[in-house]
């Protein structure tokens, strides 16, 4: 609604002006679109090239939305465990095959150049970054079916996403996320 866009737009402008990073929870493509449409004018009013506003979950974003994220210098934190725990149900019942196959589009994020982290959404699924990385690499459902072969990422990319990629989305990459002199272990 226009009220939601106005409210979100005011929040984004205030945050940009104060140098406060915002992480916005979006599941569906409509929620993602609302954020993109709201952040674009806010950034025109309050330019901030290193804002690193991040979409959390962002499960059903399509390729065009990832391109918009890139244009807006946004980050994404995708719920990689989702396929294992609910992939079969999403494929069969809730969003259908086409959307289920492109959910949590890690490869699209990487190929588009959108800085990416991946997460487990603990306590929704168990906290375990290596399982989260495994989920992004393999995209297996609980039944053993591969869901979205084209969105698989490599092991190195998955490890980056749970370490320095995650730190980057939090503006903490100068403090954590990699083993370097001066960083916290």
Language-model regions: role of each:
Residues 75:
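Ligand-binding beta-strand-loop-alpha-helix segment within the catalytic cores
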């Amino acid at each position: 609604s226009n009220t939601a866009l106005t409210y979100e737009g005011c929040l984004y402008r205030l945050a940009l002006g104060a140098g406060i990073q915002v992480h916005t929870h979006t599941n569906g493509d409509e929620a993602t679109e609302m954020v993109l449409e709201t952040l674009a004018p806010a950034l025109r009013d309050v330019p901030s090239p290193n804002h690193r506003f991040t979409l959390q979950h962002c499960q059903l974003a399509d390729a065009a939305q990832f391109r918009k994220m890139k244009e807006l210098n946004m980050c994404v934190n995708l719920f990689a465990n989702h396929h294992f725990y609910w992939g079969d149900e999403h494929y069969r019942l809730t969003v259908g095959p086409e959307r289920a196959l492109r959910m949590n589009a890690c490869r699209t994020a990487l190929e588009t150049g959108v800085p990416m982290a991946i997460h487990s959404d603990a306590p929704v699924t168990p906290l375990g970054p290596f399982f989260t990385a495994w989920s992004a690499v393999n995209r297996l459902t609980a039944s053993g079916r591969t869901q979205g072969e084209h969105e698989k990422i490599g092991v190195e990319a998955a490890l980056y996403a749970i370490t320095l990629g995650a730190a980057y989305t939090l503006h903490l990459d100068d403090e954590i996320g990699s083993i370097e002199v001066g960083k916290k272990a």
